[in-house]
Amino acid sequence: MMLPDWKIEKEILIEPFSKESLQPAGYDLRVGKEAYVEGKLIDVEEAGNVIIPPKKHALILTLERVKLPDDVMGDMKIRSSLAREGILGSFAWVDPGWDGNLTLMLFNASNEPVVLEYGERFVQIAFIRLEEPAKRPYRGNYQGSRRIALSKRRVRK
């Protein structure tokens, strides 16, 4: 069962929480403080925006920390306004028990650069209640992330 707006506000820890981002059956996550584009870490808060060049991908940190109970998972979709500009998103499930800011991958399939402003709503997350709490909620490599998290596959020695 997907959670409606009033249950999201009551049951899911999202900080900082924005009433404007709360949707009937989801929450719009906003562009956070960091991005990673073409091998460079960008301070989006200081720069005011991040530019995703044509035919390139970017990792974008969410402004919000999301903490899920052990019986709720998240499913994310790119906002349609960005999809209409050629932005594609590849997002994993947000597992029950997750706690942290999310690092999300966007790809600019267009021939024009796309600018994302700091604090702009860019991805909607919907919350789905499981029939029962997970026996093994998420406690993996990215748990507690507050900054851009690059792939742990490339960090291995």
UniProtKB/Swiss-Prot annotation:
Disulfide bonds: none annotated. GO terms for molecular function: dCTP deaminase activity; nucleotide binding. Its EC number is 3.5.4.13. Keywords: Hydrolase, Nucleotide metabolism, Nucleotide-binding. GO terms for biological process: dUMP biosynthetic process; dUTP biosynthetic process. CDD domains: trimeric_dUTPase. Pathway: Pyrimidine metabolism; dUMP biosynthesis; dUMP from dCTP (dUTP route): step 1/2. HAMAP family: dCTP_deaminase. Catalyzes the deamination of dCTP to dUTP. Belongs to the dCTP deaminase family. This is dCTP deaminase. The lineage of its organism: Archaea, Methanobacteriati, Methanobacteriota, Thermococci, Thermococcales.
